[in-house]
Amino acid sequence: MIDVNKFESMQIGLASPDKIRMWSYGEVKKPETINYRTLKPEKDGLFDERIFGPTKDYECACGKYKRIRYKGIVCDRCGVEVTKSKVRRERMGHIELAAPVTHIWYFKGIPSRMGLVLDMSPRSLEEIIYFASYVVIDAGETPLEKKQLLTEREYRNKLSEYGDKFVAKIGGEAIQALLETVDLEKEANQLKEELKEASGQKRTRAVRRLDIIEAFLKSGNHPEWMVLDAIPVIPPDLRPMVQLDGGRFATSDLNDLYRRVINRNNRLKRLLDLNAPGIIVQNEKRMLQEAVDALIDNGRRGRPVAGPGNRPLKSLSHMLKGKQGRFRQNLLGKRVDYSGRSVIDVGPSLKMNQMGLPVPMAMELFKPFIMKELVGRGLASNIKNAKRKIDRKDDDVYDVLEDVIKEHPVLLNRAPTLHRLGIQAFEPVLVSGKAMRLHPLACEAYNADFDGDQMAIHLPLSNEAQAEARLLMLAAHHILAPKDGKPVVTPSQDMVIGNYWLTMERAESVGEGMIFNDLDEVRLALQNGYVSIHTRIGVRANSMPEKPFTDAQRKQILITTVGKMLFNDILPKGFVYLNAPTNENLVSGTPDEYFLESGEDIREQLNQRPLIAPFKSGFLSDVIAEVYKQYKVTETSLLLDRMKDLGFYRSTLSGLTVGIADITNLPEKPEIIAAAHKQVATVTKQFRRGLITDDERYERVIGIWNDAKDDIQQRLMETFDPQNPIFMMSDSGARGNISNFTQLAGMRGLMAAPNGKIMELPILSNFREGLSVLEMFISTHGARKGMTDTALKTANSGYLTRRLVDVAQDVIVREKDCGTDRGLLISAIAEGNEMIEPLYDRILGRYTMKSVFNPENGETIIGPNEMINEAIAQQIIEAGVQEVTIRSAFTCNTAHGVCEKCYGRNMATGDRVEVGEAVGTVAAQSIGEPGTQLTMRNFHTGGVAGNADITQGLPRIQEIVESRNPKGPAEISEVTGTVEAIEEDPAEGTKDITIKGETDTRTYTLPITARMKVAEGDYIHRGSALNEGSIDPKELIKVRDVLSTENYLLSEIQKVYRMQGIEISDKHVEIMIRQMLRKVRVMDPGDTDILPGTLMDINDFKNDNYKTLIAGGIPATSRPVILGITKAALETNSFLSAASFQETTRVLTDAAIRGKNDPLVGLKENVIIGKIIPAGTGMTDYRQIKPEVVGGNVEQPQSLSDVEKEMNETVE
């Protein structure tokens, strides 16, 4: 066997008939499979042991030679070689065809490859191949033309007329003869001449033909190899036949298809031997052709061959295609050993890096390790006895198990794995029962809950794998989310409400205004009932020496609450004392306003002071982020565990419950509703009198009811008691939101009808009062729609993620610095007066391209090529800088990836990114994972303005990344200049916008309803939108440069996500957009040997030009092309990656003709062939590290005086 890690690249090509015979270990002559009586393979059949190898290890068919000592001997009686039975998975056979047969892939695909080489239409080819028409191969002296088609009758007439002065053939052999006569060199030269003057359709066809002919010339494939003389038979163990209970057999469809080919082939041979009439032979040849077509790609032409129950048989092509095909089912994802799955349950007492492993699972997973240890400790004499001990569940096995699982991390995975946090490593802890225990804080990353979710567990075996699991994948390291660098492990639900309740302040609580010496005294007072958790008290500041108070503050008394003292006790040493949930307190230290001079009256102060809000979920998240920034991983994971324990403990003690009495009634509700009814009546009256249109009436009614609902909501919020448990749940961010409340205590409001339109009939009741039957019925529409929407959204979002991953999988950080001289000028993204993404978010964690100066005094804030951290970003914003030029993936020069400087900070660690990081996959996951949270629907602007609907949410993201023509497009100006006039033409329903540029004047016609973005007299740049709507990037790239197009796409994608409150770092979006613009279309080839119109990778194009320039030639010119992600993924340089994505047969057909070589740079191609993945620790740089001897060996120790003497000499 070859070692997969030894080869550099993989090539694919057409197989010549000789090659097929060379691979083969023998010809399959009979359609038989196995003998049903003896169950032995039949001789010369599809499972023949002489051809494919023995069915049992080291045993020939007749049993003369058994055992490994006869290895390599061929039995003289049955002719079977004595070897391993595994060879039945590797050895091929072949079938010698009695007549040549065309390969359906090359005849059928679009465009038909055979048709292009022969310059014939697929229609004519079909007539020839399937024996409907003859074709002239050699016209000789006759007036016939080469490649002329003749019907049966015409052929007979010409034959009687000219005799054997011409040659015409039919079927596969005719095609073979034609292909053999093609002179590729001559054709190529003719086409190149033709291209010089051709245009339109003719030119396109010529370019296509030249492309294919050059492909044949370059790859060394011969066109006649598209016709088969012999077909390979794949190894029998890849198309097995198994016996079912009851003596019946189940077999792979391929065997049926092969049998048909062999049957027809044998019949044809017999007919030829018998010299049968031509028509019978022709019919048999046609049937053979169809049988081979069905074997290669069943159903591609005509009706598919069906098996029992009219089920189409699965041919060789189907074995590769789709989710169940070879690529996606077996090569990209395999089932693995040492794995298990079980239901998960909550493990509140676990540490951040632990998981609970049920004993029975541990026994099975760690079996070999336990066996080795049992033998090692002398508890079992050999491995067999050790296995027996485990099966018997002896007592000493359990002691060994405890030690074996120590320090051995395991991987936990929950499907669907939407981002890289879906697989994390934990240290196992044995638990009883059969459910695995998961740490409550790890739930958010996995999106897991405990309502019956299952998870899979995997065991890293080798020392390297264990080391990587421990160092890179331990759950404690995954505190920040890769998409935005915000903590992903934040306390939720009970933990939030516990800490919220703990940090609440209550006026007039028991013991208010007491002053304590230190935390221990406070605890004592609390336990003895002198104070409550919510009591506001004073504490000597110098009793907390580890808190960073100022010197002045240390002499004073801190006003805080008992609960806050307890909360601050869990924070790391040296972290600020948190007294208020403000950013100022968190970043700049405890504010002076919370301190008292000694001697001031504390009670008087407390009466004047407002209550401070408790700590909500968002603030806890900020605290974690700040701790992570200051103390890094270890301290943060310890804090998280303490926060979790405190939250659970305090929420239990708080005794929060929800009862019907907690849902208050709003006394003003009837008045508000009556007023709304009155307004609706007024609007209806206006409509009846014809003062307003029906649409306007509808809009107003909807508006009235929405206002009424908002009014009720507002008043509910004002009357809520901050101690109300429902309010606390929502306010703390533990569960629920305002609208849930309005529905419980206010009114449910308007509902959507099944068609998505909002019904004018509002639901006036709330759930506390109960709904009427009609109201209940109206509500159900929404519930059903919600369910279906979610289901559809999940599928759509998953498919989007798959396409994104596929297009960006080979983007890896490949070098430290690409040395580019271009940067990206960025500013905040805003729409009108709504801020979409502030500048701070955009520059944080990026490298500068140029220095940034303070606009007021000209001081340098940061130099070029430096990383912008939080402090510097804050400085830049405070200095009032509006634009910064940064290093960006858009301008990075690294081929097949990005460099560290252009990428910037790794969002998941907060440090600079390292070489080897698979940033493309991370980017795809970061954009795809929140996809399920985006809405599915298109928002209708509705109303009188009659503007086109704007697409939002998931459909808009797909529209952008697939670069489709947008719905509701905006017209763009192709010139820079002034808007001269906007003239409306009500008769036509249009308006004309005239723009006067420096050289020419352009006029654009828009519908009269379009909302304008420009006014008369405006000065606009080319590429600016004239009306509201989405710009088509394909149009934009024609009038602007690539960078502005990329910038536009970036802001459009960010707009969609930010509107839904989802933050994604720019760099992820940049990587995806860069992948859409990696290709160029060659316009003029210059002196290169590229064909005009070729789609090329930018880097390949640059390299070709570089070589041409060095040789003194004229370089080629090209223009950038924007491809949708599906198209871009299929156009990748790796045929393995493209074939495993979509359109498998088309990709492979094309790759085979071109003799493509897959350089194996991306991740997918390496996964497919089983090579180590070239990212992370699999990068070649990291794998070729050799220890180096740094200093010379010191023979004998020198005396100090000698050394001193030497030093002095060198100094002098």
UniProtKB/Swiss-Prot annotation:
Entry GO CC: DNA-directed RNA polymerase complex
Pfam family, one: RNA_pol_Rpb1_4
Reactions performed catalytically: RNA(n) + a ribonucleoside 5'-triphosphate = RNA(n+1) + diphosphate
Gene Ontology terms describing biological process: DNA-templated transcription
PANTHER family: DNA-DIRECTED RNA POLYMERASE, DNA-DIRECTED RNA POLYMERASE SUBUNIT BETA
The family this protein is said to belong to: Belongs to the RNA polymerase beta' chain family.
Name assigned to this protein: DNA-directed RNA polymerase subunit beta'
Basic and acidic residues composition bias: residue spans: 1202-1212
Residues given in the record as Mg(2+) binding sites: 449, 451, 453
Role description: DNA-dependent RNA polymerase catalyzes the transcription of DNA into RNA using the four ribonucleoside triphosphates as substrates.
Molecular function (Gene Ontology), one example: zinc ion binding
Lineage per the UniProt record: Bacteria, Bacillati, Bacillota, Bacilli, Lactobacillales
Database matches in CDD domains: RNAP_beta'_C, RNAP_beta'_N
EC number in record: 2.7.7.6
Keyword hit for Isomerase: no
